[in-house]
């Protein structure tokens, strides 16, 4: 990108400008109003469009730029608490699009991927569980909200970098209630360039052959025995945690 401009500041000013117009603004007009030459502004517009921050529409002979009303530029770390409140509200209302746009806003505003997990998504998990335990939402609503949060976690995973050799972690959930936490942990580790093997909920796979399954798993995921391999288990019960940990100790 061209020198002399702060990308975050350009994006903030651009979003504010586009929000002021319902009919779209041409690239030439954007360049004039932001005081940035056309060539440089064109590069910014194409970059922000590729990120999904803005969109372009051809209307007649004009190419006009728009921004969705849910798109905004955030300031981190100051906005983590505000975003978590919005995230919870949208999830409880089962409004998928605002949830995904909120995560997109976080990513485009340069929030740290692991912080999106720890400051926004993970605090929401017990709040949803409490609503269910208190009888304020039903099972189907809880499942829908869980799916929305899993999709949000997947969005973060898609923006993770390449894994580093020698940093390996197996993450699993001993029950369905721990799935969101295990998937959150997987996304957080991926954001730190770990080579993650996320197994998910294995409660239906626990039987007398479980030790054998673990041997096969380790032989495939850690063939070279290079670096470190961490096994991270999430469980709502001490029994589930102990059973799986004992199984791994038996095959280490």
Predicted features and spans:
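A short acidic, leucine-rich amphipathic alpha-helix
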Residues: 29-31
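Short secondary-structure capping/turn micro-motifs that flank functional sites
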Residues: 34, 64, 204-206
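Long amphipathic alpha-helical segments
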Residues: 36-160
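Residues that mark the N-terminal boundary/hinge immediately upstream of a DNA-recognition element
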Residues: 10, 24-26
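C-terminal regulatory/effector modules of DNA-binding transcriptional regulators
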Residues: 135-138, 151-252
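Short helix-capping/hinge SLiMs at alpha-helix to coil transitions
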Residues: 18-23
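Short alpha-helical segments that sit at the start of domains
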Residues: 1-15, 77-78
